[in-house]
A protein has these predicted regions:
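Conserved C-terminal alpha-helix-loop-beta "cap" of PLP-dependent enzymes
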Residues: 161-217
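Conserved PLP-enzyme active-site core in the AAT-like
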Residues: 1-176, 189
Length: 217
């Protein structure tokens, strides 16, 4: 589930020497933590907030987009970039269009020490980077700049259509919870005796491949 601001504050009280709070949001299921509230807590204690937004690189492009279509209301959680995080890591290859293994480290405000970050990166990065991978990041940035609005609109339309039609499938339960990213679709057919693996095999036979199977989801 989501990481609560109170849990973050409890952790900071237990570990007063900590210099930063690092947390993932959204998680693998698309559940987002309240980064805005967490950032307020973290900064009140004089710490940095680092968000691993590996599964949420797309959220920035959905901000402010509410959609009411096919009788379905879609709203999207805010990105960590817009919620006060100091450092945000986006795995652009997961939900955007860059090649596998690519990601972006975003730094905001004056709290992070840019020089220290650059020094640490030199210790872990290769001295022979893949220019193919780096080029794919540039291409992804250009794509989202030039066609991002159109692509996101089509994405929203497809999501609305899916959720509208899924309502008519007897026994199909779709996970709904506060802070859930609608682009992450969590299906449960246990009402018909389907386990998660059964549902995965059923979908695979029809050319649809699940990203994760866990229990009945």
């Amino acid at each position: 589930g989501a990481v609560s601001p109170s849990a973050v504050e409890e952790a900071l009280l237990r570990e007063p020497e900590a210099e930063a709070v690092i947390l993932p949001s959204p998680n693998y299921y698309g559940i987002c933590s309240d980064i805005l509230a967490i950032a307020e807590v973290v900064h009140r204690y004089g710490k940095l907030l680092i968000v691993d937004q590996a599964h949420g690189a797309h959220l920035k492009f959905f901000e402010g987009r509410l959609q009411e279509k096919y009788g379905i209301h879609l709203s999207f959680p805010p990105s960590a970039e817009s919620s006060g995080a100091d450092i945000v890591i986006d795995s652009t290859h997961k939900t955007l269009a860059s090649f596998t293994q690519t990601a972006v480290l975003n730094v905001f405000g004056k709290r992070p020490d840019i020089s220290a970050i650059e020094d640490k990166l030199q210790a872990v990065e290769s001295s022979s980077p893949s220019y193919l991978l780096m080029a794919s990041l540039d291409i992804n940035a250009d794509l989202m700049k030039e066609k991002g609005s159109l692509l996101v609109k089509k994405w929203q339309d497809n999501l609305s259509r899916f959720y509208e039609e899924a309502v008519s499938v007897e026994g199909l339960r779709i996970m709904k919870t506060e802070g859930l990213d609608p682009t992450k679709i969590n299906l449960d057919m246990s009402a018909h005796g389907f386990s998660g693996n059964d549902l995965e095999n059923f979908l695979m036979e029809r050319g649809i491949f699940a990203e994760l199977v866990s229990g009945n989801i």
